[in-house]
Amino acid sequence: MKLMTMPSEFQKALPILTKIKEAGYEAYFVGGSVRDVLLERPIHDVDIATSSYPEETKAIFNRTVDVGIEHGTVLVLENGGEYEITTFRTEDVYVDYRRPSQVSFVRSLEEDLKRRDFTVNALALDENGQVIDKFRGLIDLEQKRLRAVGKAEERFEEDALRIMRGFRFAASLDFDIEAATFEAMRSHSPLLEKISVERSFTEFDKLLMAPHWRKGISAMIACQAYDYLPGLKQREAGLNHLIVSLKDNFTFSDHHQAWAYVMISLAIEDPKSFLKAWKTSNDFQRYVTKLIALYRIRQERSFEKLDIYQYGKEMASLVEGLRKAQSLSVDMDHIEALDQALAIHNKHDIVLNGSHLIKDFGMEPGPQLGLMLEKVELAIVEGCLDNDFTTIEAFVREELAT
């Protein structure tokens, strides 16, 4: 197969391939970018593989950076762009089901491609637009099928994270997993416990943000892989609820909304501990737990001004997005009206602060000062007090007199 037109991302990088070939080596576009071009999807990263060894690659170009030279990767700075160029390589026995014990550089493209995970990711493209397909990846692309390169059992035993990648690709590409590949994923799912939680989180997160995320979750359920992921053991019912409880065409607006609804569907009692088990950042934990709290408030009643002040318009909109996907009542105009009606959006908007209370009223730093500031803040938010210096002073005097 030959591409009639090279996408602009590849055209810009063609001089890189040309320079390498003029130096006497082979060079090709490889991996996900080739797959995405053939599927007419946006290209994110342009990866180049070459028969030149790292030091040989560095000798060809004036500006290079050693970003992973021990694995054969050199970053080339050329024509205003940055390109990762990796030497063809083979990999020795894997340790810990996630990384090869040794990487060996080779001159053969086919040897390099055979170590890759799925056939649709094992395609290469030369400078003339000719697709090199050693493992029937083009047929799999045409039939929307995800199939492991070579023996599926070996691919997943080498790197168990490929199981999560399989679920993610099913979700992002809307592909079905080929039977032998699926069976190997199922039988090797216990190895997911050997994978770092951070790497599993990255793949699961990408799955949830994919347009066909239900397909990825369904495959995960069918493989029973969830039993080997943090907080998901014996959670099949909750995962099924996650799939069926939202409208068919719904996709999550952002990562916070996705993980919040995962925990809502699973009826997680302690969201923070659940997210800690996934080793997420403290900021992520705080935002998602607040989002769940606001979702539960909305289950009981309509939003009020204090809700929008405390949680923010953006978070309230994420809640309404989930409600809309469940065919529940939604009122985005109400959120906008409440936000517009707020005299302040955070305590720093208040014209009077603690320093004024200490200076003008002789208050001491401590709990009483903090309580007075909270009273002022709440009164302004609820519309009982204007955000005006003189008015607030009068309010404070009255409060201190009682």
Curated annotation (Swiss-Prot):
One MF term in the entry's GO annotations: CCA tRNA nucleotidyltransferase activity
Gene Ontology biological process terms from the UniProt entry: RNA repair; tRNA 3'-terminal CCA addition
UniProt entry keywords in alphabetical sequence: ATP-binding, Magnesium, Metal-binding, Nucleotide-binding, Nucleotidyltransferase, RNA repair, RNA-binding, Transferase, tRNA processing
EC number in record: 2.7.7.72
Organism, scientific name: Streptococcus pyogenes serotype M4 (strain MGAS10750)
One Pfam family hit: PolyA_pol
Protein origin, superkingdom: Bacteria
Annotated residues for binding of Mg(2+): 45, 47
Transmembrane residue ranges: none
Extra remark beyond the main annotation: A single active site specifically recognizes both ATP and CTP and is responsible for their addition.
Enzyme category, top tier: transferase
Protein name per the record: CCA-adding enzyme
Residues that, per the record, bind ATP: 32, 35, 116, 159, 162, 165, 168
Cofactor: Mg(2+)
Family note: Belongs to the tRNA nucleotidyltransferase/poly(A) polymerase family. Bacterial CCA-adding enzyme type 3 subfamily.
Self-association state and partner proteins as the record states: Homodimer.
Reactions accelerated catalytically: a tRNA precursor + 2 CTP + ATP = a tRNA with a 3' CCA end + 3 diphosphate; a tRNA with a 3' CCA end + 2 CTP + ATP = a tRNA with a 3' CCACCA end + 3 diphosphate
Record: residues binding CTP: 32, 35, 116, 159, 162, 165, 168
Its job: Catalyzes the addition and repair of the essential 3'-terminal CCA sequence in tRNAs without using a nucleic acid template. Adds these three nucleotides in the order of C, C, and A to the tRNA nucleotide-73, using CTP and ATP as substrates and producing inorganic pyrophosphate. tRNA 3'-terminal CCA addition is required both for tRNA processing and repair. Also involved in tRNA surveillance by mediating tandem CCA addition to generate a CCACCA at the 3' terminus of unstable tRNAs. While stable tRNAs receive only 3'-terminal CCA, unstable tRNAs are marked with CCACCA and rapidly degraded.
